[in-house]
Amino acid sequence: MKIPKRIQPLVDDGLVDEVIRRLKSGKEADVYVVRCGQDIRCAKVYKEAENRNFKQAVQYQEGRKVRNSRDARAMAKGSKFGRKQQEETWQTAEVDALYLLANAGVRVPQPYACLDGVLLMELVTDEDGLAAPRLSDVPFSKEQALIDHAAMIRYVVRMLCAGLVHGDLSEFNVLIDKDGPVITDLPQAVNAAANNHAKAMLERDVANMTHYYGQYAPELLGTKYAKEMWALYEDGKLHPETSLTGEFAESTQAADVEGVLEEIQAVIAEEQERLREAQDPY
């Protein structure tokens, strides 16, 4: 097929020899099957911000570290340079996440290069060497659903231990090869410790997985893996090989509203006293 304009620089640099076909078009990127020498890989072409259909991207970028202070200031101001840097940060976030998670024992595609908004990475394949199907396209027996769901929960735990939450995990960005699930699409992955939305995103990720596999194994629908793992994470007790039960006892203790109000009043009183002393040092 005709070489897409965005992939041409990779061809010019000898990274890609042939574009075979478009594999999929998503809300944040188009993916092509490409030939690199004797290897068949895929090229993920990120869409520009104005063409992406990724809602509330700002929530996902909260807590991300920007190494260069000049870049951080430009991004905060929203200048043309800042928007360009914001785009590069969005794209490189996926590369960083892929390397981090692979080292953490999470099954993800292997990245090879990222150039001008194009990520060259492993093409995940099935037993016949064809592009692996998405989870949404694979039927399961009850037994296999339980096995794969357990694998996904294990990967989510390892991600959290590595400091990341996927943030957009669903049956549409998990591939199934001969060895089980492979997690994809990570540009929006969030910093678990620095993003105020991380807990809610984790719960949504796990709920999506549980709902899908629960179609085949209904007993999964009553599990509370997200709440269990987050509680352990907050207490510093979550480890990559932590064995979860899927059970979580919600706190039944009533909130001490009166006590909280007393603390607030005490803080206000202290601040008022401090201001009085500042105005009248004698």
Region spans (language model):
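Catalytic-loop of the protein kinase fold
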Residues: 161-171
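Regulatory N- and C-terminal appendages and interdomain linkers associated
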Residues: 1-25, 143, 147, 151, ...
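Flexible, glycine- and charge-enriched loops at secondary-structure boundaries
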Residues: 84-87, 91, 142-149, 195, ...
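Conserved ATP-binding subdomain of kinase catalytic cores across diverse folds
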Residues: 1-131, 157, 161
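A glycine-rich phosphate-binding loop feature that marks nucleotide/adenosyl-phosphate handling sites
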Residues: 117, 173-176, 226-232
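Catalytic activation segment of kinase domains across protein kinase-like and atypical kinase folds
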Residues: 37-48, 128-138, 142, 170-215
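A local structural micro-motif
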Residues: 18-19, 109, 167, 177, ...
